[in-house]
Design a protein with these regions (language model features):
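Alpha-helical transmembrane cores and adjacent cytosolic helix/loop segments
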Residues: 1-209, 213-217
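Short secondary-structure junctions
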Residues: 220-222
Length: 222
């Protein structure tokens, strides 16, 4: 098992746990926001699987049909990830707009708070490893996880506001609005990943300093 696979394995285990917890609790409590957040975690899970598959394919040696290797697969995989994320975001917005108005419970707040903590630690871990290994798929996965932290924070705030809906009527829509906001955040993440990887494929992305130094060393040594 290589370094990338190890990192993604940790992410898969964490996202599977969080996704199941949020979807189950969201369904029981009829919370559109928590369900949306659960689907967001599920999209992280899809990202992880894509990352592992893309990394394996990118490591294949060069052949007659691919004399420069299969490195581009890494970026194409990231583009595939971004498309899945965008579709999930649109689906969440649609479902939230047509959901019933409900009051969030204390358990929704607790689950969201736990998620915020775990996802923040996970996202920082993945991004740090991705930069160290110079692996674009890991970085894309880490950014998606970071967006999940923000969406969980939105759910947490909406759950708190919902408690005060008895006194301020407009707060009863907080769960519904939070679901829509989470959907927008997911779509934004998808577009950012899509833009970055298309730029790399088209040669528009600036080469990072560390990579540039390696290229210079290779040229000087030859």
């Amino acid at each position: 098992m290589n370094n990338v696979t190890k990192v993604m394995s940790v992410s898969i285990i964490t996202n599977t746990f969080l996704s199941l917890i949020k979807i189950i609790i969201g369904f029981i409590c009829k919370s559109s926001a928590l369900l949306a957040d659960g689907v967001h975690s599920f999209s992280d899970l899809l990202t992880d699987f894509f990352a592992i598959i893309g990394n394996i394919m990118a490591k294949k040696p060069a052949d007659e049909k691919h004399p420069y290797g299969h490195g581009k697969i890494e970026y194409l995989t990231s583009i595939g990830i971004s498309m899945v994320i965008i579709i999930l975001g649109l689906t969440i917005i649609n479902n939230s707009m047509h959901s019933k108005v409900v009051m969030s419970s204390l358990i929704v707040s607790i689950v969201s708070l736990i998620t915020i903590t775990l996802k923040y630690l996970l996202s920082e871990y993945i991004i740090r490893k991705g930069k160290k290994l110079e692996n674009n798929i890991l970085i894309a996965s880490g950014k998606e996880s970071r967006a999940d932290v923000i969406s969980s924070l939105v759910v947490f705030i909406s759950a708190i506001l919902s408690v005060f809906s008895k006194y301020i009527e407009v707060f009863k829509y907080s769960d519904k609005i939070a679901g829509i906001i989470v959907g927008i955040l997911i779509i934004r993440t998808g577009f950012l990943i899509l833009k970055e990887n298309i730029s790399i494929i088209l040669g528009e992305q600036e080469i990072k300093g560390e990579t540039l130094n390696k290229i210079r060393k290779i040229i000087l040594n030859n």
